[in-house]
Amino acid sequence: MNKRAARTVLAALVLPVVGASTVACSSTDAEAGSAPPVLVQSVLPVGEANPMIAEGVGIGASAAVYKTSGTGPSAANTAAPQGSPESYIDTATFAGGVLPAGVTVTEAQGINVLRKIRDNLEAQGLGLADVTTMRVFLDNAPGTDRADYAGWNRAYRQFFANTNLETGDTELVPMGTAEPAAPLERNPARPNRFALEVASLPVAGWLVEVEVDAVYPEGKGPR
């Protein structure tokens, strides 16, 4: 085993119809053929009970993969000017488009986007727990010099990577500057992910656009 492999844990994501879980899988077992092949194998950092993302994800040759298009937020906040970043605040979470203390527009748009992705996946017989890869594009809000990565990451933790891998307990997640609380959706999945700032996004007012890949549970495929 090389030094890099020694510093990582190979965790096989078992993807049943009802969700996903992580289990340890040693290379010795795999070489001996004592363990069945897995659809997805995530490489997670050693010593971290609650990592945000995987270091990498391996997809088995037999896996059926669903890829979403780039998804931005819906214009749900009719109280804000059309085409403004505030018009894309998720009113299902923030009544009237009013943001609590510390919640940023990027954070609110991120929640909006991840709800849409969840609905997209569920229409295909999938869920957020089946997501293996995520690509995130952020624009900076008007009057700021840099994309709001912290706000995006808070939104992300509301739907992903919010369980303790050692105990299985739900991890509490902050929203804005509020005290950490139960996430909007409990999900142990840690996809591989990139997040980067772009010069602009295709729709006026969008600060967040996301696309994901998800693997169908064993024995299932596109509808």
Residue ranges of model-derived segments:
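N-terminal presequence-like segments and the immediate start of the first folded domain
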Residues: 10-112, 119-124, 129-132, 142-223
